[in-house]
Regions:
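Catalytic-loop motifs flanking and including active-site residues across diverse enzymes
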Residues: 70, 107, 111-112, 211, ...
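ATP-binding N-lobe of GHMP and related small-molecule kinases
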Residues: 1-103, 117-129
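Generic, low-specificity signal for short hydrophobic/alpha-helical stretches with a mild N-terminal bias
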Residues: 2, 17, 28, 56, ...
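Gly/Ser-rich oxyanion-binding loop with an adjacent helix/lid
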Residues: 83-173
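ATP-dependent small-molecule kinase catalytic core of the GHMP/sugar-kinase superfamily
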Residues: 131-268
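Alpha-helical scaffold segments in soluble metabolic enzymes
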Residues: 15-18, 76, 114-118, 218-221, ...
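Short alpha-helix boundary/capping segments
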Residues: 66-69, 106-107, 204-207
């Protein structure tokens, strides 16, 4: 018997000041706050159906039946929502994205934001934007930023209660366009979850985190004043800092490809 069904649409977000490393891996509490912009043209549409006739959760992603870690991660997140609602009905999840998954475009952020909203609706619950952001964070840290609209700041907090994202400016405040160059659409060899774990092994991570608050204040101010020169400088600096941490982690992570460097030089 179908218990209920609902659909939600979410968007990935591109971080200006990035999230990298946790103080609590289970709760996905970040070591530093972050600021991002939601990408309106990229979408993830997810339908969740709780169906008591199912033997277990079923997850279809872009028409492909999922198993292993992908299914397990989705089921674990649904268990949080089922636990809040107080039932254990299996679910069928249908999710489709119009952009590459696992290629550095925050696909997990959009996926878990959409999954959270759809599952909460399907379970017949109502939640505030703050609580949806908190809950989405448990599935993927960056998903907290895909709940509020427009330009978003993730407040790092120190517990599950106070780590969530808020909108600092609506989309129409500053109609920026993010130009995305996909140099490879294959899945990253090292996922972000593993990257967050390895961040603490880099001797550069503590310095990156220590200066994050200053960069966040400058970034927030740049958005409010629509100062593109300042914003672009901050974005490049913060990106380089993150990749420096990745390069110096143990084992090292290299997300840049030869084509990446060619594009970086061309833009300069």
């Amino acid at each position: 018997m179908i218990f209920s069904t609902a659909t939600a649409v979410s968007h990935p977000n591109i971080a200006f000041i990035k999230y990298w490393g946790n103080t609590d891996d289970a709760l996905r509490l970040p070591q530093n706050g972050s600021i991002s912009m939601n990408l309106a043209e990229l979408t993830t549409r997810t339908m969740v159906t709780f169906d008591s006739s199912l033997p277990r959760d079923i997850f279809d992603l872009n028409g492909v039946r999922q198993s292993g870690p992908s299914l397990e991660r989705v089921s674990q997140h649904l268990n949080l929502i089922r636990g809040i609602r107080g039932f254990s009905v299996p679910a069928h999840i249908l999710s489709e994205s119009n952009f590459p998954v696992g290629a550095g475009l925050a696909s997990s952020a959009a996926a878990f934001a959409a999954l959270t909203v759809a599952a909460v609706r399907t379970a017949g619950m109502e939640m505030s934007e703050k609580d949806l952001s908190r809950l989405a964070r448990r599935g993927s840290g960056s998903a907290a930023r895909s709940i509020p609209p427009g330009y978003v700041e993730w407040l790092p907090g120190s517990s599950d209660i106070d780590s969530y994202a808020v909108s600092i400016a609506p989309p129409e405040h500053w109609p920026l366009t993010d130009c995305i160059a996909i140099v490879e659409d294959a899945h990253k060899k090292t996922g972000s979850s593993e990257g967050h774990l390895l961040a603490r092994t880099s001797p550069l991570q503590s310095a990156r985190v220590a200066d994050a608050g200053r960069r966040i204040d400058l970034c927030r101010n740049a958005i409010q004043k629509k100062d593109f020169d300042l914003l672009s400088q901050l974005i490049e600096l913060d990106s380089n800092l993150l990749h420096a941490v990745a390069f110096t982690s143990n084992p090292p992570i290299t997300y840049w490809l030869p084509q990446t460097l060619v594009l970086m030089q061309a833009v300069k």
